[in-house]
Amino acid sequence: MTMLIVAIGNPGRQYTWTRHNIGFLCADKLLQGFPEAQFKEARKLFSDIAKVESPQGSMVFIKPRTYVNLSGKAVSAVKEYYGIPIDRILVLADDVNHPFGNVRLRQNAGGGGHKGIKSITQSLGSNDYWQLRLGIGRPQREDIELSDFVLGQFTEEEQIGIQSLFIEASALFSQWCSGTQTA
C-alpha cells in the first residue's frame, strides 16, 4: 500500500535553511537512501513530488508549494489522487514546543499551534494521520517574535546538531515504514 510522506515548509531559496523548513530538509535527508528519487513539480497537486519503491512498498514524498499555512490543500489533493488512506500519511513538521533536536512520532496528535498541521487536519477532516515532529525550540530572547524565529536561519550550533536530529528522525521513519512504531 502506498505511503504519503508530507514535508512541511515554504517554497523558495530564501526559506531553505530556516527552522520552518526543517521538514523539507528532513525529507531530503530521508531520500538520500534512494538515489533515483528526484522531486518534480506537480502543479495540479500543488506540490513537488518524489516517488520511490522500498521493501515496505511505494512511497510518495511531497513538498507542498502552498506555503506552510496552506499545506492541507496539497495534502488533500495528493491523498485523493493516489488513494492513500489517512493512516498511511506521515507529516514531517517543525515543533516549537520541544527543544531543538527532540524528535517525536505520534498518531492522532494535535497541532500544538502549528498552522500547517491545522491546515492539514482541516483539509483531511481528521487528525488520524502520523506526525514526525522535529523539535526546533523557542526563541531564547523575549523580544523575538515566534514568526521571526521560525522563519529565521539556523544558528551554527543548530546546524551542527541537526545531523543528530536527522539520525533520530530516520530511525523513527524506518519504524513507521515497517509498522513497528508505537503511537
Curated annotation (Swiss-Prot):
Hydrolyzes ribosome-free peptidyl-tRNAs (with 1 or more amino acids incorporated), which drop off the ribosome during protein synthesis, or as a result of ribosome stalling. The gene is pth. It comes from the Bacteria. Keywords: Cytoplasm, Hydrolase, RNA-binding, tRNA-binding. Its EC number is 3.1.1.29. Monomer. This is Peptidyl-tRNA hydrolase. HAMAP family: Pept_tRNA_hydro_bact.
